[in-house]
Amino acid sequence: HGTYTPGTATYSQMDYMLKVAGFGNFHVGTIEGYPTFETMLAQLKAAKAKSVTLVPFMFVAGDHAKNDIAGEWREMLEKEGYTVHVRMEGLGQIPEIQKIFVDHIRFGLKHRTQGIMEKKAVYAAGEKNE
């Protein structure tokens, strides 16, 4: 999906990390923010790609995935001459991602949240005991 907030930087970082890891045929584009559709399209052209598989990088492949990715993006890429395939599966359908979420929930249930003021008090108390 993307965002117009500074958090958009994570998407270009993901694109960079994929390429550094050897996945040069993966390109990240966002509906809102950066990298834009045009940025991704330029990468596809530079790579001389003939076909594209669009995969939503969202937990649930809902309306945005259907309307924007499987709809508008698919149409725009087809107009550019690409053969386009769409994999309408959200990240939440992937067992490994489900496991990460369950592990985080279990961790949260076992450990209580500690506020910054409480942490500072612990640090201050530790310094006094030295």
Question: Where in this protein do the model-derived segments appear?
Answer:
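Extended amphipathic ligand-handling, pore-lining, and cofactor/metal-binding catalytic surfaces
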Residues: 1-130
